[in-house]
Amino acid sequence: MRPTLSVPLISKTIRLPLILVLVSTFSTTALAGAAEQKIQGLWVDNKDPSRQKFAVMVEDCGSKVCGSLYWLKKPLFANGLPKRDKHNPNEALRERPLCGLQILTGFQAANDALWQDGEIYNPDDGLTFSSTMKLSPEGTLKIRGYVGISLFGKTLEWVRPTEEITRCK
């Protein structure tokens, strides 16, 4: 019969503090990585470049955050003229070009990963919705548009572009 070694590699008095230090270190590192991500910059509506329809440039607007259409897959009508904000409920604004149109307004940072009290404008139907934006640990931007309360809404998920995108004109 072979003798067995019964001496633990790490004594019980050291084991728990060591585990706590390791967990704390990894948790802090993960949180720091999420906090280093910025909402500002370019976002596209789909991971697959062949399915992308638009890109939005998110930037600081004073003490708040806003975003404008930066690129459109189809920026022109069939007649070659630039697409306009033709569904806007305000007739005076219907001739604005979609390219460069501000569609995200008034977002205030609640913390490093959440922006609230904003609005998102949908030029496809001319409707404006209350909105929040959340930056996920995976690096996606989740925009929730809703009427009244957030429960009754829709969430869009945007990603950073993987290919170079040229600003529309």
Residue ranges of each PLM-predicted region?
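Bacterial N-terminal signal peptides that target proteins for export
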Residues: 2-18
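Boundary at the C-terminal end of the N-terminal hydrophobic targeting segment
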Residues: 30-34
